[in-house]
Amino acid sequence: GIGSDGLVELGTESQKERYLPRMATGELRAAFAITEHEAGSDAGGIRTHARKEGSRYYLNGVKCYISGGSKAGLITVIARTNTGDTGKQFGVFLVEPDFPGFRIGEIYETMGTKGQPIAELVFEDCEVPEENLLGAEGDGWIAAMKILNNARPLVAARCVGACERLLEISIDWARNRKQFGKAIGEFQAIQFMIADMAMRTEAARWLTYKAAIDSDNGGAAPQTVSMAKLYASECLAFVADNAVQIQGGAGYISGNPVGRFFRDARITRIYEGTSEIQRLIIGRALTRH
């Protein structure tokens, strides 16, 4: 996942041996921290800074909206390593929650994804041993973009899975819910809604397969994974909205699973790169000379 990908891509054998086995068993949860209050889509604008003194780095700054941040046993942190506020000289650091100078800030109340805490992470001269630097000091920007690139097919796959379940629920409802003396699935309006839900889900599935296959075969082009992530997340928004609509008032009642899907779907167009950023990536790739 996104929390462990930097370790897999850049980690030394010693670093991997120290953390990956416990991640594989579920003993150790991981998180990825790049977003800041003034650096969301503009990831190059991050201000969290790493200062090296002797055999340690000292991190100062605040990361926000970090998925699983308050429960993680290891956090991959992107921090600026140059002395100024410009340029893209970043490092990737493995931070454990018991390192001196680290603390959990605000834990946010969110619209959806209630099972995943979203937290603010505060670094106040947080001491990080130099052996917890991933790669070289200047590797951070390229590493961060690669981590996000690798994560986007996973977001797309989650969206496709949610679409499939919503489609199943909607078909079952259409077959069994009766109005005007017959199942609502016999009405053309409902049939058209379900047809569009199924068509878009299938298209999202094959875009996701394409991104995953290319990634497995040595690396997908950024526009390919952006297409998969963008289309699948927007497909989920469409499918979730229609699933609520098909159930009418029942779909709006708390406790109904379609309502949870509807709330959870919203974040997929934001994290791992907003829909707007995905369109920028795709457009720039296609128009570049």
What are these regions, as identified by a protein language model?
Residues 23, 38-41, 65-68, 82-84, ...:
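Short Gly/Pro-enriched turn/cap motifs at secondary-structure boundaries
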Residues 26-34:
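A short, Trp-centered hydrophobic/proline-enriched beta-strand micro-motif
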Residues 16, 33-36, 46, 62-65, ...:
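Glycine-rich, charged/polar anion/phosphate-binding loops
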Residues 56, 60-104:
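A short core secondary-structure module
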Residues 31, 45-49, 56, 74-78, ...:
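Conserved hydrophobic/aromatic beta-strand scaffold that supports enzyme active sites
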